[in-house]
């Protein structure tokens, strides 16, 4: 049984690769989400189409049609935030199943090509149905590509950038890429707030002042302190070096005080989580201030 996992690109049939066209043409059955199927249906007359995007339900359809050649189609490229990866793993359990993969043009490669940006310089994020730590990624990368969740999702990212103080960064927003109504706009975060943004969108944020350096032992004076004791800079530096915190570590700061250790933990564990535990009401307010001042999105105050 041949199963083809096909990336069809962004929706314009003209961007479908020749190999992908041949795979779909040879298939008896084509499975995919409605928007994706609708974009190619007229070019592949006579195929049996199933409108489905759930991995397990697709697997059931494949089981029920074991004697057929089947193409499962996905938007963009099957290697970038695609259900193709999950389905590939699921199909490994099938006996006598040959899995063929066909890459497509992704929104990332398309937008980078349109704007002359080297993909190798780009940090890739997705806010489509999940949260990411925005501040650190923008602060430490020259280019950040984001797949957003609908038009309002793009505006929410712009609001966050403004709250972080990133007023002057250039954002390139791509809408309805490859379609006749494609629009690519470069502007500041505030300029997008009153725009009518398509739900099919992605963006690249350019930060020419990005800083990839990660350090610890910040000067004591940079923290909000009041009368709450603070772990001194030199002590903090030794503690953090001994902890050997990685980017995805889960950290606990018990008796967090002013939150200086928590803040520095959060900078090191920028893809992880820091739990700052404190019972002193004055200290709790200081921790809140420091979280705000350092845009430490990955700290949870307990």
Whereabouts are the PLM-identified features?
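A contiguous loop/helix-start segment that scaffolds small-molecule binding in enzyme catalytic cores
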Residues: 2-5, 69-70, 143-228
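Conserved alpha-helix/loop element of class I SAM-dependent methyltransferases that forms part
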Residues: 232-247
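Conserved class I S-adenosyl-L-methionine
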Residues: 248-257
């Amino acid at each position: 049984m041949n199963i083809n996992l096909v990336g069809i690109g962004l929706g314009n049939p003209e961007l479908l690769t020749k190999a992908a066209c041949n795979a779909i043409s040879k298939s008896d059955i084509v499975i995919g989400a409605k928007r994706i199927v609708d974009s190619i249906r007229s070019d592949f007359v006579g195929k049996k189409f199933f409108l489905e995007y759930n991995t397990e339900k697709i697997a059931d359809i494949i089981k029920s049609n074991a004697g057929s050649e089947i193409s499962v189609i996905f938007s963009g490229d099957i290697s970038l935030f695609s259900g193709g990866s999950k389905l590939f793993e699921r199909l490994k359990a099938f006996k006598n199943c040959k899995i063929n993969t066909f890459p497509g043009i992704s929104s990332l490669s398309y937008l980078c090509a349109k704007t002359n940006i080297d993909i190798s310089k780009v940090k890739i994020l997705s806010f489509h149905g999940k949260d990411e730590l925005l501040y650190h990624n923008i602060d430490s990368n020259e280019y950040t590509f984001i797949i957003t969740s609908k038009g309002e999702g793009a505006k929410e990212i712009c609001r966050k950038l403004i709250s972080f103080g990133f007023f002057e960064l250039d954002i390139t927003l791509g809408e309805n890429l490859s379609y006749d109504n494609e629009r690519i706009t470069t502007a500041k975060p505030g300029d997008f707030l009153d725009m009518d943004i398509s739900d099919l969108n992605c963006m690249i944020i350019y930060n020419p002042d990005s800083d990839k350096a990660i350090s610890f032992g910040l000067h004591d004076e940079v923290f909000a302190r009041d009368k709450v004791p603070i772990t001194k800079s030199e002590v903090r530096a030794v503690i953090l070096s001994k902890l050997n915190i990685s980017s995805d570590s889960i950290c606990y700061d018990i008796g967090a005080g002013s939150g200086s250790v928590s803040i520095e933990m959060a900078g090191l564990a920028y893809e992880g989580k820091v739990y700052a535990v404190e019972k002193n009401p004055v200290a709790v307010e200081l921790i809140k201030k420091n979280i705000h001042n350092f845009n430490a999105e990955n700290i949870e105050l307990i």
